[in-house]
């Protein structure tokens, strides 16, 4: 049963079918605010339906994210109807966001649209009253289903339910037109190919043909939007399989024009269980591991990633080119410098050695050498030494006799490295180490630093 009684809204111009049990269970958990929105629209004589991704995810029994509503109510009337709770987020496209209970719900007026001249947005939008027509302009059959909550009816004019049962991604109607209308649908098709199992769905041949024919239209889509879709693909369980398919279909070059060929071995590596916990920067570093650091930087710049993603990707990619020695002190410095990247770094180096992939410009490491390092790493105890240096500049000057300046700073860094290497957590022990250092002689530029590599 619904959380509260709901009056029936205007009927759809479609024949519906009773919602299956999995959808009915979801409807019974709908937020009260959603019911209130539907009820108010029905009170004014409008039709209102839950639509798109929320219906798809609920059918699978997945956690439902955004709940989207479509309605015959024009946006201007919606703004008046919901007053201060209404936000005109996309009125020109019929979308109004309704606030309530700390959440936001998008309500979009049914639309009829003309040509998409820029490959992304319709040239002209007119409000409609036909749910059939509205669903017919959506991207894929699995996203073109709607639910009448009050009547408990599912509207599925393009057989999205059958395609979900058969694990097929199919365009609504003419696949060529769908790709021409909105070129971002090309990337969305690949994103929907996998649903957490690691196995890919089949792409309908007509959709695949349309994507291959129109992939060049991706250049019409803002790179930020392309990157947003690819970022989601990168984090999927079957990311390697999806990206490999994109490369074979001639699509990946519109995402990574600087890195148009990637070894199939790397795609296979991306789908290993050990790799599935990696972050986006770590996955990007693996994907582009055969390219030089400068090329990776240009790739991140082209994608207009966030500064953090660019910095983390370039840093991890560069660090992957190096390995610590299989000695406790070296590994402690490695752990200190890389932090949470340390364990993924060693894991990836072992994976790359196992599959025979060479990092650009670096000699091939055999698995046995990596095993020596990982064996020592596995026996490494948690650090006792604090991450910050135990002593400050005043302490250094009083113990060493070295005055303020670059030489003192370099000496402190050298001592800090020793603190980490030897896992020292006591100032007296550190003072003993200082007394053994030949800091009164030699060029300070050659003193060890606390860094990796």
Explain the meaning of each model-derived region.
Residues 1-453:
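Catalytic cores of the polymerase beta-like nucleotidyltransferase superfamily
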